[in-house]
Design a protein with these regions (language model features):
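HhH-family (HhH-GPD) DNA N-glycosylase catalytic core used in base-excision repair
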Residues: 2-288
Length: 288
């Protein structure tokens, strides 16, 4: 089964309308007001980690759910529920005390498209090591974060490199992670040109604050540094809105669109993401 390409070409759509900057900002702000509502959380995978009251559980559940956020919405919800059910009432406690020999079998029947229970168990083991070293995923991420950088691109590259360099010997006795290991799909990198949709989605959930949609529990990362979580569906929408002319849903497009959005809200450029996604998920017409 082929993997969904985060840098896949976008089919040409209806020609975009020519809008002034003021008109485009008004349109985006209207979409934000219309769709950024808590009663629409049920249409998002974010509704799953929202069930946990404790921030450490939201962090771990958020990473698991965001990692599985590819495929159709029902499938994502089903797989996320299955994964978290196997982890018990506290995902953070499960990961902190994770032992491969004891706990990997909990995921023996797990499948999400081409990712298997082994991939999910190894992901939990990598998260376990990150928490063991730094205490939280935020602290692990912050090792590579520089607030002076324009965006979180360099921090993501560092995060991915360090995560994939952790011990894998309980799953691969050679101690070397194979190039085609399924767990690598959970850790794409801007260095390879990937749009990193799911990692950027997780960061949006953790960092953004103020409207009750995202958690805002990573207070040491600025929302101004976030990059739009871009996949082919969002890419089609932003092209139709006139935010980019690029044809590939890759890191270049993600950063270009984010720069355009930053001109409308320098402090919170990805606040429009939830609304843009609702257009696709709810099959609403894209404004021309």
């Amino acid at each position: 089964m082929s993997r969904p390409a985060e840098a896949a070409a976008i089919r040409p759509g209806v020609s975009r309308a020519v809008r002034s900057r003021a008109q485009l900002k008004q349109l985006l702000d209207d979409l934000y007001v219309r769709y950024s509502r808590r009663d629409l959380l049920s249409t998002s995978a974010l509704s799953v980690p929202h069930r946990y009251p404790r921030r450490e559980d939201r962090e771990i559940a958020g990473f698991i759910v965001a990692s599985l956020a590819y495929g159709n919405v029902k499938q994502i919800h089903r797989s996320a529920e299955s994964a978290l059910e196997a982890m018990g009432p506290s995902p953070a406690r499960f990961v902190r005390h994770f032992l491969p020999a004891r706990d990997a079998g909990r995921f023996r029947h797990f499948v999400h498209r081409f990712n298997t229970g082994i991939d999910l168990a190894l992901l939990c083991y990598l998260l376990h090591q990150a928490l063991e070293r730094r205490g939280s995923l935020q602290a692990f991420f912050l090792e590579g974060y520089d607030p002076a950088h324009e965006d979180i691109g360099a921090a993501l590259i560092s995060f991915v490199q360090r995560a994939l360099s952790l011990d894998v010997s309980p799953f691969y006795p050679s101690g070397t992670l194979p190039a085609k290991a399924g767990v690598r799909f959970f850790f794409p990198s801007p260095a390879e040109g990937s749009a990193c949709k799911r990692l950027n989605l997780f960061l949006r959930w953790m960092v953004r604050r103020g409207d009750g949609i995202d958690f805002g529990i990573w207070t040491e990362v600025s929302p101004a540094k976030l990059i739009l979580p871009l996949d082919t569906h969002v890419a089609r929408i932003v092209r139709r809105l006139g935010l980019t002319k690029r044809n590939q849903a890759n890191w270049r497009m993600a950063t270009e669109v984010t720069r355009r959005l930053r001109a409308f809200d320098p402090d919170d450029p990805v606040k429009y993401d939830f609304a843009l996604c609702r257009l696709g998920i709810l099959k609403e017409p894209i404004p021309d």
